[in-house]
Amino acid sequence: MNQLTNFMNPVAKPETFDMIKIGIASPERIRSWSFGEIKKPETINYRTFKPERDGLFCARIFGPIKDYECLCGKYKRMKYKGIVCEKCGVEVTVTKVRRERMGHIELAAPVAHIWFLKSLPSRIGLLLDMQLKQLERVLYFEAYIVLEPGLTPLEKFQLLTEDELLDAQDEYGEDAFSAGIGAEAIRTLLENLDLEQERTDLMEELATTKSELKPKKIIKRLKVVESFIESGNRPEWMILEVVPVIPPELRPLVPLDGGRFATSDLNDLYRRVINRNNRLKRLMELRAPDIIVRNEKRMLQEAVDALFDNGRRGRTITGANKRPLKSLSDMLKGKQGRFRQNLLGKRVDYSGRSVIVTGPELKLHQCGLPKKMALELFKPFIYARLDAKGLSMTLKQAKKWVEKERKEVWDILDEVIREHPVLLNRAPTLHRLGIQAFEPVLIEGKAIQLHPLVCAAFNADFDGDQMAVHVPLSLEAQLEARVLMMSTNNILSPANGKPIIVPSQDMVLGLYYLSLEREGEPGEGMLLADMAEVHQALHIGAVTLHSKIISRVPQTDEKGNEYLKRFETTPGRMLIGECLPKSHTVPFDVVNRLLTKKEIGDVIDQVYRHTGQKETVLFADAIMALGFRHAFKAGISFGKDDMIIPASKEQLVDETRSLVKDFEQQYQDGLITQQEKYNKAIDAWSQCGDKVANAMMDEIRATPKLPDGRLAPINSIYMMAHSGARGSQAQMKQLAGMRGLMAKPSGEIIETPIISNFKEGLTVLEYFNSTHGARKGLADTALKTANSGYLTRRLVDVSQDCVVIEEDCGTTRGMEMRAIIQGGSTIASLGERILGRTTLEDVVDKDGNVIAPVGTLLDEATTQRIEEAEVQSVKIRSPLVCEATLGVCGKCYGRDLARGTPVNIGEAVGVIAAQSIGEPGTQLTMRTFHIGGAAQVNEQSNVEAISDGTIEYRDMATIVDQRGRRLALSRSGEIAIIDSEGRERASHKLPYGAQIMHKDGEKVKKGDRIAEWDPFTMPLITEKQGVVKYQDLIDGKTLTEQVDEATGIAQRVVIEYRAAGRSKKEDLQPRITLLDDASGEAARYLLAVGTMISVEDGQTVQAGDVLARVSREASKTRDITGGLPRVAELFEARIPKDNSVIAKISGRIEFVKDYKAKRKIAIVPEEGDPIEYLIPKSKVLEVQEGDMVKRGDALISGSPNPHDILDVMGVEALAEYLVAEIQEVYRLQGVKINDKHIEVIVRQMLQKVEITDGGDTTLLPGEQLDYLEMMEYNAKLPKNGKPAEGRPVLLGITKASLQTRSFVSAASFQETTRVLTEASVQGKVDSLQGLKENVIVGRLIPAGTGAAMNRVRVTASSKDAALRAAMRVANQEHLIAPRTAAEEHAAELAQGPEAAIGDDPLGKVQGEDFTTDDVMVEERPEGASEE
């Protein structure tokens, strides 16, 4: 019987294998799978509905149609099991075998497998060293190929047309050489390949080749040849002689009503193949003319191509309704393919969905489940319980009772549901908090009730959202749901470690209102003894919630004893104080202030850190109830009159109008350019808008005193916005201020602002202007969702196999963290960045005392101490430099953000990182900003001191000009501020030509301006004095007078000059030369295109004068990619559009020579060889001849190319750059993400190395492979062998996911056919280490609880082996112990099939009846269950 469908062991359980290998099937292998040859294209008999014999659904080949019944009906029932009916030839067995048994088609002529032919690079082409075009001509019978030239002058592999072939045969004789056509010819060539010989030839060629491009091609071929040798695949197997036919149940034929049939497309494709094959056989028997046979063979080839991959070559074969037929490849590919539809995303039973409504009276761990829904979901449990209680005799009766909904059923439902958590999920599930467990509470109605505090995690609102309910069935699942997924366990967000259970909207408003303190309220200044008195006073109206009172509040000391302490507070704040947990770590002070949404979040954070999870949950529930109650009691509402339009608006608008008129006039008079006018106008209007907004806020914020001495009630709109409940200052500005400037869809700003606000109403023109940008916004939102989802998918795919696998990898590398400071304000403090990380070195304060020893996990208290000691930088461990193989270690990762504890082994940190970065993706913008207008305002143009200290110049050459200003002349210089203890507080890079306010060593105060510069132009400053001489500056060729058409003012500008014709003399280099007194050349300055010259020819200049200006506008008007596209660009490691050029070494700049459109410059180091760069002339150089540059400095401005950073500066610098750039995009949107998530992803992008030196291994220079694989190769070397070396390569996330070591995971991501083709040629083995592969083969993932199970499995199998050895010694007399693996296998086979089941140590453990190891020994037959 066939090995695939051994009835005792039908399909290998996913637990029993550890690896999956993919290869190319040989014809023998295909025949051994098959249960018979399919000879006819018929499917079933349409009259009797019985399958045709030898057809595509033949019962004799594939198995019976009904269980244990042969086709003709001679044998029925179980007792004939295994008998083959002599009449119809059908074996009596279960129908299920029709899902497993395969057939085959013997082809009359060999056919090439389209995957190996057309999947680029073509494997057949690489092996034979032929082009795909030529191969196709041979395979599709258009040309002959010379197989053996014999003694003729023809060459092997030469293509001949039919006429050429006949001529050659006439000339040399028919037997002098042999030529072939079609797949047969290719097969002969592949059979005759000597792979070993080919390998040695290629190696020699590689060693001797001189050209640049050759090695790449040779390496490609060498790889294919080697993979064939190593995998044991034969090249001729890429040509098929036998086509396998998949089991009929997998390509079903279903009768529809009305006598029609619905069938799988595969049946059509198979029928085509069989028809053409049979016709070809007949033609060959009839000895038909060659041309007819050849045509039939070509058609057969095309039919098989269509079966395997329809549409890959030639016309797509379509069905009756012009729809392309789905081939085998299409079954796997894409979102609807096998991988993504059925293996990675399955539908589950025991689930339901319904609309959600709010459930404010629920506890945090509860959800309201409609009774009807619960009854349906928990049916099996109810049947079991009815049965156990003896209420129903049979299952049928139990069903009836449940359907009739008798009252006993409801009681039992209550019992069943108690303590049985359910999972709630809201699509789209963007992060792991999108599925959480709750305890169901039965409710009437048909809607699910959801606790208001978890809405933020689900991103749910109650405007008609739906949610799905799932029931965890097994005990383990219930346990995990309760211990790990319960909503009470998910208080902190895994993205940033801040609480995600934070009150919002009404609750915030209520708490804000409670914590308001107001002057002149009744009962102000009362002294109240304690909480009871406060309640009483409130009840009788002696005080209001906002009266200032003095009262005693119960506090807890460190020993846990209560005592009373006096506070100046308000009754409202005391009500909030009542909810606080009783602990000395959260004193009443935390709520004795005005609470906005942010502050409430901080309080919850503090409560969680100091008192733990249980107290936090109780506190959250309490303040939620309090918030709702008081939002309701406050009765806050607003009307039109609450939007107060400031009185000063008119005047401000008029002032700005006249200002803009002035700009218009200046433009007409030619004092400013069009662009400058636009910028100034937009500046003026945006400032006006801000002034109006500020005036409005002042008026709305104000609470004037009423005649009776009380304050006027606070403005409701202001309360809502200020508390963070709803609305923002920007929205208030539009309601009652001035709508402001609008953008066009292109992102440019329209020059005329909208002066009205919504209260006044817009004019028609204003309304039209505002719709322009609004529509763009709506269209963007739709695109954004899809883009963001795709980014998340790629991120998950690249990082899914990154799991914490050990405690400590023991690395000595790390990253240096310091505070991020931009434009004088701290964006991220040092404490924020190192919180929850592990130190790499001792952290010491200025006196040398250790604050945190090496290996400390920094918690809040320690980081606070570090910040107080004013430590400037801390070295920490990072997942980037973690040396753990196949994952990261706990120390490098640090704290698990969602729990606030050190990370557990088995935590899937990769997926968490991907979700944390992808989830806020929908909040990012899609725009690429065109700079222009208001965006220019934020261009930085000065540096201020962030603290007191002393100025220190570093590599900073300066010059003092005639006006006594000190100008920076160095391009890589820095200016640092050193504090009194000698520590560096800040260092700033200054642009060339910046004016520096202080001398080296001068003292500065905090907030002093250190330097400033013009952000829009870059000057060219002379360092010597002399006389200006123009060179190659010829009017009309390289120099032009540009006159602004509107103003008539002329400026001399250098233009690009292309020499006409081929005259070499005309190669002009526009430059200014300075002549000193002796008329010698003192200095020369090359001028880039677009430079405006500020001096005359022959003018005398002093040191420090400006010779010319380059407009930085030119280098700055490029689009800034913002938002989501920018994040994607960084993660894909794309080379940016205007990429800068980085100096690879430090040295002096020299200009070598000019070419037509490029210029060659060199960096000459102090020792070693110079490095040359070719730079387009259109680019503005940041350096001049003779400048000193440092390694990593930019030669041309622009966005740096991440690959360059990696090559020049190393892994840490690259990571720092990527983290900073990605964080900046998110920070602009106000999204907080912890750095370590980005580091995890960058780690996955840096897994590969490019071999620089193969050493004594078989690796070739230029090959790319995993760092681990390179180490494996090196480990195999003999003792004194020279190891291979490589340099890290940065791969984009898509590329990195496609190049994972697991082919199953890569195939399920993208380009399925290509991945599988490559894997099968190499005979790849997937060791199933990542998460995705395990999901696909259907076992527990090796993360979380699955990691523990994995460990158990390993120990169990080793124990098994030990037991077996012991048994073998005991049974020595029964069984002579086999010594080799082969003998052992033979002994196993001799025992019959029963022994070979139960390979899996956990397979024995089923349900309740656990058996211990020693009991198992007794039951097992000798030597059974070999692993």
Swiss-Prot record:
Residues annotated for Mg(2+) binding in this entry: 461, 463, 465
Keywords: DNA-directed RNA polymerase, Magnesium, Metal-binding, Nucleotidyltransferase, Transcription, Transferase, Zinc
Binding-site residues, Zn(2+) 2: 809, 882, 889, 892
Domain of life of the source: Bacteria
Cystine pairs: none
Record region (Disordered): 1394-1427
Amino acid composition bias (Basic and acidic residues), ranges on this chain: 1417-1427
Cofactor note: Binds 1 Mg(2+) ion per subunit.
Catalytic activity: RNA(n) + a ribonucleoside 5'-triphosphate = RNA(n+1) + diphosphate
GO molecular function: DNA binding; DNA-directed RNA polymerase activity; magnesium ion binding; zinc ion binding
GO cellular component annotations of the record: DNA-directed RNA polymerase complex
Cofactor(s) annotated in UniProt: Mg(2+); Zn(2+)
Record GO biological process: DNA-templated transcription
InterPro entries registered for this protein in UniProt: DNA-dir_RpoC_beta_prime, DNA-dir_RpoC_beta_prime_bact, RNA_pol_asu, RNA_pol_N, RNA_pol_Rpb1_1, RNA_pol_Rpb1_3, RNA_pol_Rpb1_3_sf, RNA_pol_Rpb1_4
List of residues binding Zn(2+) 1: 70, 72, 85, 88
EC number(s) recorded for this UniProt protein: 2.7.7.6
Complexes and interactors: The RNAP catalytic core consists of 2 alpha, 1 beta, 1 beta' and 1 omega subunit. When a sigma factor is associated with the core the holoenzyme is formed, which can initiate transcription.
Family designation: Belongs to the RNA polymerase beta' chain family.
NCBIfam families: rpoC_TIGR
Function statement: DNA-dependent RNA polymerase catalyzes the transcription of DNA into RNA using the four ribonucleoside triphosphates as substrates.
Protein name in the entry: DNA-directed RNA polymerase subunit beta'
Origin species: Sphingopyxis alaskensis (strain DSM 13593 / LMG 18877 / RB2256) (Sphingomonas alaskensis)
Gene transcribed to yield this protein: rpoC
